[in-house]
Amino acid sequence: MVSKVKIGIIGGSGLDDSQIIENRTERVVNTHFGIPSDVLIEGKIAGVDCVLLARHGRNHSIMPSNVNYRANIWALKTLGCTHVIVSTATGSLKEEIHPGDIVIPDNFIDRTTKRVQTFYDGNELLSGVCHIPMEPAFCNRTRDVLIETARGIGLGVHEKGTVVTIEGPRFSSKAESNLFRQWGADLVNMTLVPEVVLAKEAGLCYAAIAMATDYDCWREAGEDVNVADVLATFKKNVTKVTDLIINAIPKVAALDWSDTIEELGKTVNTSIMLPHSN
């Protein structure tokens, strides 16, 4: 039996416009883990069932540390999503990744300090402790669709990259930025973790479209990262992200995901250690 696809889209800075979805219906969802960042907007893109959620709220009022990542992911799961495709603004740590470039990340480094990274925290809904493996960190089949779609529409794309997620809301110091470069990271952002971890725990096929908006602050020449430039670059290039999402969604829906979803479910189930009596 072929699994029906429903795609959750989490929009970051500059990509929270519900107009990309047709036949929109707003859904207020309250989860066991609290209230999501905003209402969820259900509808269709290219005939495919989708749900759009603004990560920071539609008024961009929620700072990265205060996003209820668990509620966001669980709400998408509750509404029947099989996939989550997200956009994220990032700082480039590599000269060859220019502001305005698109990257499809394949790995991450976690430098957050305040965020709950599991649904299995002793609550009455989910028993046990989940030691979810994070290799691969992202759904490679979904990543492949995004990469192939980008090529097909003539959009230049970096086909992999490691993202360092920092706590924020401050930007990195120059010493931190250079340290991340020494670690081999390609990008720095504030939202990918714990989102990517929670999506895997929830058994969802998760992939990200990262846009480089700046060069962070590691370069000796050039302007250091600032909010105005980040927003201006994202606004100038956001159509690249929306075009990629709109064109990729029907390609995702055309594939049979039954085995992929089943394997994800098995990974979650075999990662849970249930309490036992001595």
Swiss-Prot record:
Compartments reported by the entry: Cytoplasm; Nucleus
Site feature location: Important for substrate specificity: S172, V227
UniProt keyword annotations, A-Z: Cytoplasm, Glycosyltransferase, Nucleus, Purine salvage, Transferase
Disulfide pattern: none
Gene Ontology CC: one annotated term: cytosol
Keyword Cytoplasm set for record: yes
SUPFAM superfamilies on file: Purine and uridine phosphorylases
Enzyme class: transferase
MF annotations from Gene Ontology: S-methyl-5-thioadenosine phosphorylase activity
Catalytic activity: S-methyl-5'-thioadenosine + phosphate = 5-(methylsulfanyl)-alpha-D-ribose 1-phosphate + adenine
Cytoplasm in keyword set: yes
Pathway(s) annotated for this protein in UniProt: Amino-acid biosynthesis; L-methionine biosynthesis via salvage pathway; S-methyl-5-thio-alpha-D-ribose 1-phosphate from S-methyl-5'-thioadenosine (phosphorylase route): step 1/1
Binding residue positions for phosphate: S13, R55, H56, T88, A89, T191
InterPro entries given in the database record: MTAP, Nucleoside_phosphorylase_d, Nucleoside_phosphorylase_sf, Purine_phosphorylase-2_CS
Sequence positions that bind substrate: M190, D214, Y215, D216
Function (record text): Catalyzes the reversible phosphorylation of S-methyl-5'-thioadenosine (MTA) to adenine and 5-methylthioribose-1-phosphate. Involved in the breakdown of MTA, a major by-product of polyamine biosynthesis. Responsible for the first step in the methionine salvage pathway after MTA has been generated from S-adenosylmethionine. Has broad substrate specificity with 6-aminopurine nucleosides as preferred substrates.
Entry-linked NCBIfam families: MTAP
Quaternary structure (record): Homotrimer.
Assigned protein family: Belongs to the PNP/MTAP phosphorylase family. MTAP subfamily.
Protein name, entry field: S-methyl-5'-thioadenosine phosphorylase
Protein's organism: Anopheles gambiae (African malaria mosquito)
